[in-house]
Amino acid sequence: MSDGTGVRGRTMAEKIWEEHVVRRADGEPDLLYIDLHLIHEVTSPQAFDGLRLAGRRVRRPDLTIATEDHNVPTTDIDKPIADPVSRTQVETLRRNCAEFGIRLHPMGDREQGIVHVIGPQLGLTQPGMTIVCGDSHTSTHGAFGALAFGIGTSEVEHVLATQTLPQYKPKTMAVTVDGTLRPGVTSKDIILALIAKIGTGGGQGHVIEYRGEAIRALSMEARMTICNMSIEAGARAGMIAPDDTTFAYLEGRPHAPKGRDWEAALEYWRSLPTDPDAVFDEEVLLDAGSLSPYVTWGTNPGQGAPLDSVVPDPATFSDPIERAAAERALAYMDLQPGTPLREIRVDTVFIGSCTNGRIEDLRAAASVLQGRKVAPGVRVLVVPGSMAVKAQAEAEGLDRIFRDAGAEWRNAGCSMCLGMNPDQLAPGQRSASTSNRNFEGRQGRGGRTHLVSPLVAAATAVAGHLAAPSDLD
């Protein structure tokens, strides 16, 4: 549609994209200016080596922020890192940041944490920005109305050298979630339900904009959970239009605009939401009121179902590729079709990650664990997403609730989300995890992962099997 002048309305993604195009040429990707570049120890070393070989410097070190998160241990952080590969990567990041003048939040620093937790926490993430990081879950920052996506190591080098990035313009998808969530149903359940609905390739080539009354009702931290897992639906990025909830979260944060700059920023930010007459390439509808707690049963985030249901029978899948994938998944997960999901027992519960390691997530888990005990034989790791989140949780007494229940209270890091640090599953162990990926071996070779919300994770810790808080009453 157009406004009567022949000019079609634009989506939020289109507005931000067009405002950041540095150069455009027929048959070539657009060259985008990048407002914020986040880096960590895993995907940056080769990029810095490339700069040295070419004799280049970092063009905008002031727009580049580094943290240590993927490989860092979450215990004994005052001691040297035991794993030699992890230690080398962390030490290399420190040397590179010192050489090229990049601000680094090292292990133990109050502002250290998972890269997608500290960006918003510090007010670095702002509406209308282009944000990149050598990490799949950079889409988290889209919760603020930013265009944020993950990039590869060669692209990390390109951004370091030029503060630009060549990209082909993606398509747009609107996911509208109307209605009201029932008690015990969270933003994690929304995104797991969406991925189960459209599949892990349903958003391929698109930027997803999440809309609707259920999205508007979410806090910023809940919105970040949804945008974080956009990549698990195959999307390039996920976004939510900025509103008063966004502005209230940002105001007063260390890197947020101040004074007159704040007022000017608000004026710009309010211009970003999608125009009423804009047209999306694809549209998907979800009814929030029909959703219930979701869990995954397989080995990709799209293989999920309501907790009230049973392990599906691959024979019921009409698509032969999906049927084969389900058969392989059930063999790996050691599950039988028809088994009630609530009967699946776990060895480990992990509460943390860039998906669900923020203060609201920890409060939710603590509300379930308070006055209760972890089931015998179940190990529970609670890992805050940043050292600032850890400090806030301890100020609120959440750490005591976790410890009293029998959980382990750790320092900040990616931890058991991925098998790149000491926090891993042993072969054959099964976890309920608030993270974002349940691939084979993701949490350790031979480990089996069920993705859940913090509420379900905490209830599972008490019950010893997949459970919702209502099951404990």
Swiss-Prot record:
Record carries keyword Protein transport: no
InterPro entries, alphabetized: 3-IsopropMal_deHydase_lsu, Acnase/IPM_dHydase_lsu_aba_1/3, Acoase/IPM_deHydtase_lsu_aba, Aconitase_4Fe-4S_BS, Aconitase_4Fe-4S_dom, IPM_dehydratase_rel_enz, IPMI_cat
One Pfam family in the UniProt entry: Aconitase
Enzyme Commission number, as recorded: 4.2.1.33
Alphabetical UniProt keywords: 4Fe-4S, Amino-acid biosynthesis, Branched-chain amino acid biosynthesis, Iron, Iron-sulfur, Leucine biosynthesis, Lyase, Metal-binding
MF (Gene Ontology): 3-isopropylmalate dehydratase activity; 4 iron, 4 sulfur cluster binding; metal ion binding
Entry's Gene Ontology BP terms: L-leucine biosynthetic process
Keyword Lyase: yes
The record's free-text note on cofactor binding: Binds 1 [4Fe-4S] cluster per subunit.
Record: residues binding [4Fe-4S] cluster: C354, C414, C417
Pathway stated in the Swiss-Prot or TrEMBL entry: Amino-acid biosynthesis; L-leucine biosynthesis; L-leucine from 3-methyl-2-oxobutanoate: step 2/4
Residue segments, region Disordered: 425-448
Reactions that this protein is recorded to catalyse: (2R,3S)-3-isopropylmalate = (2S)-2-isopropylmalate
Domain of life: Bacteria
Cofactor: [4Fe-4S] cluster
Family assignment from sequence similarity: Belongs to the aconitase/IPM isomerase family. LeuC type 1 subfamily.
Subunit relationships: Heterodimer of LeuC and LeuD.
Function summary: Catalyzes the isomerization between 2-isopropylmalate and 3-isopropylmalate, via the formation of 2-isopropylmaleate.
Protein's UniProt name: 3-isopropylmalate dehydratase large subunit
